[in-house]
Amino acid sequence: IQETLKQQNTQLEREQTSYHREASRLESLRNITERYDGYGNSIRRVMEQKNHVPGIRGVVADIIHVEKNYEIAIETALGGSIQNIVTDNEDTAKRMIDFLKRNKFGRATFLPLTSMHGGGGIRNLEALKEPGVIGLANTLIHVESRFDGLADQLLGRTIVVDHIDHGIAIARK
């Protein structure tokens, strides 16, 4: 009887450990789903893999931090790229594209950091001296230094102005 009881206790401990591990995983997936509510299925599926696949950094919206008064301008400048998935390199991006295809989860756009070298800046630096110019969009955000190339690529050619009329005047020149 003692041996049977010991075996059952050992089995119970294994089952409890397994239960807690799965409960923790479920909670983690729920948090990801809630956090990425409003994103496409493919993006949510990739972000569910973030803790299991090294090299997934997050979506652009998670990486770029903006002061409240510039949020609308930066979100507008980013457009759909705000939901693009940032990876360390092309291999991680390829792996996740394969994951999406294999499971028929849809498509997503990936931005490997190894391919982000800036957008070359604006052609006419004189435009920054025009009335109403606040600055280049990439200078109005905060990112970790490893994401500087990404920020430059996405926002380094966008001038933020205080009023649409100033923007129109600059665009016409």
Language-model features and meaning:
Residues 1-2, 116:
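Short, compositionally biased low-complexity segments
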Residues 2-6, 13, 20, 27, ...:
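Residue-level encoding of the coiled-coil heptad register
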